């Protein structure tokens, strides 16, 4: 159960949530929680923070029917303009959060009331799994993954906090004017608010990579844990993650899967066999491993540039499944 690996959950209604429930998104934890609001000075803006329509104090559009207040500030004790031991969590250029904020997010998750145990996709599940990785490995997750997987697998273009290793010009910009980051261009900083306010390293978002590097991870999985002659995972672990499925949803452990009963709701093309595992991403990404045909399909785009609501056609027109379909149709010829 979760409290064995995350002491902060002891005594909360999350302490009996299992790792399997987190991986299947059946933990009962809500789909979303605006952690960043705790860092905002409530007295720095008038009225409500968000509005469905623009008005005199809400001009900045952040979604199809959502506008944010024009002016707000962060709490001075939580946000600084330069790095220090007390403010190490970089959210954007010249924006550093207090070190206590990361722990306060986990404490907040502990306090959020659980809902029923039906399937409910939630980033919070994977934020908790990241805490488990760190508490078991006794290392920050980015350093653990670097040491155990990315460096030995020569995934040289894969990193959390990529600006520590790469020039800004080498990184595709994610969003043009992020309202939580004072209208700055996000280039080399994670877009997802929860991951950003964790300092850029999270279980739900924050990893920068290339299609070639992502493919290596999926190749490792369908090759039973071996890559380039070296074993990284046991065959049993790979088999478990490739075959274990939920009894109440289409999901696998940590992975999404084709919906063989409902092609309209499926994240994959109809031609994809039920053995396929993978994931889609909010910023316009997807990666799928097909152990049956020994295929890996990776597609990376920056859908949310310049604005998060500009390219929703990627979903509406089913671009990712249709690209996958072309691949399977080519196999059948």
What are these model-derived regions, one by one?
Residues 8-9:
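Aromatic- and kink-enriched transmembrane "portal" helix at the membrane-lumen/periplasm boundary
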Residues 225, 279-333:
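Structured C-terminal helix/loop/strand segments within mature extracytoplasmic catalytic/sensor domains
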Residues 12-274:
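Short, surface-exposed loop or secondary-structure junction motifs
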């Amino acid at each position: 159960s979760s409290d064995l690996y995350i002491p902060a959950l002891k005594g909360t209604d999350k302490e009996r949530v299992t790792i399997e429930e987190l991986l299947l998104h059946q933990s009962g934890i809500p789909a979303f929680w605006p952690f960043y609001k705790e860092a905002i000075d409530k007295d720095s803006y008038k009225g409500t923070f968000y509005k469905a329509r623009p008005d005199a104090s809400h001009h900045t559009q952040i979604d199809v029917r959502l506008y944010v207040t024009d002016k707000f500030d962060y709490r001075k004790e939580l946000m600084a303009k330069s790095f220090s031991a007390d403010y190490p969590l970089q959210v954007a250029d010249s924006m550093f959060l207090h070190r206590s904020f990361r722990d306060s997010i986990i404490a907040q998750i502990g306090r959020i009331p659980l809902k029923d145990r039906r399937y409910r996709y939630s980033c919070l599940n994977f934020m908790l799994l990241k805490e488990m990785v760190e508490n078991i490995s006794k290392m920050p997750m980015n350093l653990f993954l670097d040491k155990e997987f990315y460096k030995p697998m020569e995934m040289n273009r894969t990193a959390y906090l990529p600006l520590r290793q790469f020039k800004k010009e080498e990184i595709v910009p994610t969003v043009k004017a992020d309202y939580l980051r004072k209208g700055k261009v996000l280039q080399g900083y994670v877009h997802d608010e929860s991951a950003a306010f964790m300092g850029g390293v999270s279980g739900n978002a924050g990893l920068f990579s290339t299609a070639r590097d992502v493919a290596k991870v999926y190749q490792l999985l369908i090759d039973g844990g071996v890559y380039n002659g070296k074993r990284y995972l046991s065959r049993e672990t790979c088999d478990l993650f490739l075959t274990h499925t939920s009894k109440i949803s289409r999901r696998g452990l940590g992975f999404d899967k084709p919906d063989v009963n409902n092609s309209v709701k499926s994240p994959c093309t109809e031609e994809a066999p039920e053995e396929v595992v993978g994931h889609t991403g909010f910023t316009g990404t997807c990666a799928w491993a097909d152990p049956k045909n020994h295929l890996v399909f990776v597609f990376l785009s920056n859908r949310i540039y310049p604005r998060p609501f500009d390219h929703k056609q990627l979903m509406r027109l089913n671009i990712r499944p249709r690209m996958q379909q072309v691949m399977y149709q080519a196999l059948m010829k």
